[in-house]
Curated annotation (Swiss-Prot):
It holds the Pfam family FliH. Its main location: cytoplasm. PANTHER family: FLAGELLAR ASSEMBLY PROTEIN FLIH, YOP PROTEINS TRANSLOCATION PROTEIN L. It comes from the Bacteria. One of its GO terms (biological process) is bacterial-type flagellum organization. This is Flagellar assembly protein FliH.
């Protein structure tokens, strides 16, 4: 064998520290050294091995068995599932509540807008800002005189001043023969009229029809 091989394979060796197993009886052992055997000593490595074994033993004692670990994992999984279920139900309830509130708000807004649309259309149909239609006015007046004059006492026919000449010319004889008193009011619409008597009042103006329309719509709501 060459010197090179010897140098390469050479490893430095250190003697191990040796300790007495029962260190309390050191004095006794010193007086009886000839009685000591190999079993009375231990090295540092053996001490480490024993310590590691003790640690592993303690860890095994603390570590749960497979069945216990399975039960713990199963219980933990159930709890997490229940938490997710509760969270899901809460979110679902919130979503349904918000949806119900949104639908209710939508219905309310839709109803309000629909009502406004109806009122606007009705106002165009029966609005005040229209031209006088002699046929409409004459029809309304004749209807009231023919149907209601028998039941009315001290009756007054109230019309717009602009219709004075027209009505006096057309129904003059009927008005005076039935003892009607013609009265004029600028606040009455051009195609409307009112009847005032001791028995009661009859309002055949656009304003009255408009109020009645609003009342009927409100009752439907």
């Amino acid at each position: 064998m060459s010197n090179i091989d010897v140098k390469q394979n050479w490893k430095r060796w250190y003697p191990e520290e040796i300790f007495l197993k029962n260190s309390k009886n050191k004095k006794k052992y010193f007086w009886n050294l000839y009685k000591l055997t190999q079993q009375d000593f231990f090295t540092n490595n053996e001490n480490k091995k024993n310590s590691n074994k003790l640690k592993k033993t303690d860890e095994l004692k603390d570590y749960p068995s497979k069945e216990e670990a399975y039960n713990l994992a199963f219980k933990s999984g159930i709890e997490k599932k229940e938490e997710k279920k509760i969270l899901f139900n809460d979110n679902l309830n919130k979503l349904l509540s918000n949806f119900e509130a949104a639908i209710s708000l939508f219905d309310q807004m839709l109803f309000t807008r629909l009502l406004k649309t109806i009122l606007i259309i009705s106002s165009y149909i029966v609005g005040k800002n229209i031209k006088m239609d002699e046929l409409i006015l004459l029809k309304n007046v004749k209807k009231i005189i023919n149907n209601d004059s028998f039941f009315l006492k001290k009756k007054q026919l109230i019309i717009h001043p602009n219709n004075k000449k027209f009505l006096e010319k057309i129904i003059k004889n009927s008005v005076y023969s039935d003892k009607w008193e013609l009265c004029y009011d600028v606040n009455i619409d051009i195609n409307g009229c009112k009847i005032r008597s001791e028995n009661g009042d009859i309002d055949n103006t656009i304003e009255a029809r408009w109020k009645e329309l609003c009342r009927l719509v409100s009752e439907e709501c």
